[in-house]
A protein has these predicted regions:
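Active-site regions of metal-assisted phosphoester/phosphodiester hydrolases
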Residues: 1-34, 58-59, 73, 80-81, ...
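Active-site neighborhood of divalent metal-dependent phosphoester/pyrophosphate hydrolases
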Residues: 11, 39-53, 58-66, 184
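Aromatic- and glycine-enriched glycan-recognition loops and surfaces
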Residues: 67-73
């Protein structure tokens, strides 16, 4: 099984269009069973997306509508144009850089049959950049979560508390894979990486 995870930075990434094109070409060639993306943005003030690409599975309790520059929708459409189909879901977590709906997406070759919107941070304030969520999708009998966790030393929204919520939710599933940007350096002992390995 091929799994891939990437923090895309999407709309704020320098040379965004060229990098998106290269990424979609890579996905079309490698065709991982599942890929998970973080910092999947859309401009909050952009017009609503007209035709939603095939395979979209709305995440429960998401009230933010897809906009025409949504990165996940663009990736789905570009894959369609290459004859590659994925089911996909997108969940915004917060306002990023004062102008983006910033969130996560999961793409699956197998049909998505369920999705979960999991609040990981103490705050649920959409305008607070420290708000953290996980997007989980079920494909077959397996759950795949994409996350973008906070930092270990954040006193307001500590990594350890977010990890505890995520591990409890994923642990309740028969089989679950955790993908994402954990904001934890592997060479730093006694912090996030070690906690994940416990």
């Amino acid at each position: 099984m091929k799994l891939l995870t990437l923090n895309t930075h999407s709309l704020i990434e320098p040379d965004y269009e060229a990098k998106r094109e290269a990424f979609v070409d890579f996905i079309a060639e490698e065709q991982p069973e599942v890929f998970a993306l973080q910092e999947v943005n859309q401009t909050a003030a952009a017009p609503l997306l007209g035709d939603v690409p095939e395979g979209y599975y709305p995440c429960p309790d998401n009230t933010v509508q897809l906009k025409e520059d949504n990165h996940a929708a663009a990736v789905a459409r570009m894959l369609e144009e290459r004859g590659v189909h994925y089911d996909w879901s997108w969940l915004p977590a917060k306002v990023g850089y004062d102008k983006y709906d910033e969130g996560m997406a999961v793409f699956s070759r197998a049909p998505i049959t369920d999705a979960e919107n999991l609040l990981l941070s103490k705050t649920s304030d959409y305008s607070n950049w420290k708000t953290r969520r996980a997007l989980g999708v079920c494909a077959g009998d397996v759950w795949y979560y994409t996350v973008h966790l906070g930092w270990w030393k954040d006193e307001e929204e500590p990594f350890a508390a977010q990890w505890e919520k995520l591990s409890q939710a994923a642990g309740a599933k028969q089989t679950a894979f955790l993908l994402g940007d954990f904001n934890s350096e592997a060479d730093v002992r006694g912090e996030g990486y070690d906690l994940i390995l416990c």
